[in-house]
Amino acid sequence: MSKKSAETVKVVVRCRPMNSKEISQGHKRIVEMDNKRGLVEVTNPKGPPGEPNKSFTFDTVYDWNSKQIDLYDETFRSLVESVLQGFNGTIFAYGQTGTGKTFTMEGVRSNPELRGVIPNSFEHIFTHIARTQNQQFLVRASYLEIYQEEIRDLLAKDQKKRLDLKERPDTGVYVKDLSSFVTKSVKEIEHVMTVGNNNRSVGSTNMNEHSSRSHAIFIITIECSELGVDGENHIRVGKLNLVDLAGSERQAKTGATGDRLKEATKINLSLSALGNVISALVDGKSSHIPYRDSKLTRLLQDSLGGNAKTVMVANMGPASYNFDETITTLRYANRAKNIKNKPKINEDPKDALLREFQEEISRLKQALDKKGPSDGRKKGKKRKPGEQGGDDDIEDETEEEGDEMDEEEMYKESQQKLEEEKEKIMANQSMIAEEKQKLLSEVQKRQGEIKKEHQQKEMLEGKIKAMESKLLVGGKSIVDHTNEQQRKIEEQRLLLAEEKNRERDMERKLKEQDDKTVEIEGTFSSLQQEVEVKTKKLKKLFAKLQSYKSDIQDLQDEHARERQELEQTQNELIRELKLKKVIADNFIPVEERTKITTRAVFDEETEEWLLTPLAKAEGPSQMAKRPVSAVGNRRPIADYARMAAQMGGNPRYKAENILSVDLDMPNRTTRDYEGPSVAPRVQAALDAALQDEDDLDLEVQPEVFKAKTKLKKDKVRSKHKAVAKPGSNSQLYPQARGLIQK
């Protein structure tokens, strides 16, 4: 049965070491940590010399010398173990930007000593599955990010696609259309995470070169099937949410501008909403928890005050210039200690994928059995789905392999017999051709049927193997002796972690008891001793008083700062609202504005304003679809009318009330260009030659050339004289002169 018990959120604090940039700039370390007592003390660098340190106590604290594996074994191993038992679990890192949240969650996967919570949890989950017996597991992985209040799937092809949050009474809040991948090993789930990390939004600021610009959530769903006492399979589903939050930041320190500033604004708003949820959960007076203020708080609704076991890692920096952010982080973490969750085991959920897999495998096996086993095939022992055993499993596997071999041999043998039968028919000369053809066709038909049946069986067996390969079953690949040793080592680790926690609690209680004992003991041996004791008590009380006064002043300053930021945001929003109102008043008619405002409705699920339909539609859609006969037209049209419209211009057969009229073209005022028939150079030479010019005296030419030229001129002149008769009225043309011959 599902057990439900209240337990508080476990809060641990981790402080990173000083980096080279902080040391070079002369900043000092202001944080001191006592790992045994779980105590964190912070010194105010700007306070007066006598101001006491601010102290905070947590479940566990880790200083700058802590190791990744110690953090996992002492804090997170028990949580992952409970997820394997069917609980919901959440691990999230909280703190200022550049304090090591991503290093705590992911670390360096290539180095075993520097691996973070997520890679260590992968190893833990699949090692546990490999060592279990009589259980079936199905492991799925999803990866999403919240970037500027938009949910994106980091494993999808289109990362820019926005996903919506939905809520159901049985499962709670979930992301619609979020992709999920079935993984069978550490290597496969690490590949899924690598693909998601490559798609995640990362940027550079003055405080962090690889600053996460979005909140990322890696979701591991572990489904386990086990045979119960009643003989039925019972499924438990555990979900592990590994959350890497983007850090809160101030624009003055990060130097963010443009897109980085927009990202920082959205990050700070969502983290502010997370802080408000934590404050409301701790404050018993508040009846409303503002989960809907951001997408992050809605996704973490079960983790904060719901059905989950939660561990919060508060990361902080030790440098003096981060005093305000460090104090704010510690205060939020101190509040979160008082949040109470009610985790329960998720047994037999309706949407368990493992059950669907088992039912599908059972259906395929029944379909395979209906095909009928061959004569030589052995019938193995039937088992119920989910029932597994050590040696029996190995024997059953060998039997199944033997069955497959027998089936293949029987198929080959039947094919060989049919081939021999075909050869006998072909060799028989006494048969009539028609009878021989009929027998051959029957044999070929039987061959085809056997082949088809064999292919169907192979296809079903392939599907069964593919689906069974996704179900993880332990106790086969690892020797039982090694499993037992690993179990003992894990038990010892858990015992050591519990002993350390008990030791811290005992030291804390002893310290409180000592203080109470001194107060109760009122007997003193002398007046001097009484004065010393009371002076010491007075100093301690005065130090507490000063500490409380300092806390009150800090809270007032923080409240004033938050109020100033809210007022600034409010002024910006009012200015933007006024601008839009001026645009609406001057450019949108009053009637149209009234229509829109009366139809506007705010949808809390999508957090958007929607317009209600003008008329109530009975069906799912308001507008009716176009008829099939009117594709591309306003109204239906017959085939005859369509053909008539194509053949002629009769407006009767037109689908639209529009007449097709030819364009009325104006009279032409220009003419086409006609190029010259003779080249310009040749025409120029001809024009020059046809002009009347004096005879040219070419003295440089030889005598022979002059004589020939003179003879030619005489001949030409004589011809012209013969043509032109005296007393004729015919037009006289100019005579050719120069070097051009006519």
Curated annotation (Swiss-Prot):
Residues 338-613 form a coiled coil. Residues 365-377, 411-425 have a biased composition (Basic and acidic residues). Its main location: cytoplasm. InterPro entries: Kinesin-like_fam (IPR027640), Kinesin_motor_CS (IPR019821), Kinesin_motor_dom (IPR001752), Kinesin_motor_dom_sf (IPR036961), P-loop_NTPase (IPR027417). The N-terminus is blocked. GO terms for molecular function: ATP binding; ATP hydrolysis activity; microtubule binding; microtubule motor activity. GO terms for biological process: microtubule-based movement. It is found in: Cytoplasm, Cytoskeleton. Belongs to the TRAFAC class myosin-kinesin ATPase superfamily. Kinesin family. Kinesin II subfamily. This is Kinesin-II 95 kDa subunit. It comes from Strongylocentrotus purpuratus (Purple sea urchin). The gene is KRP95.
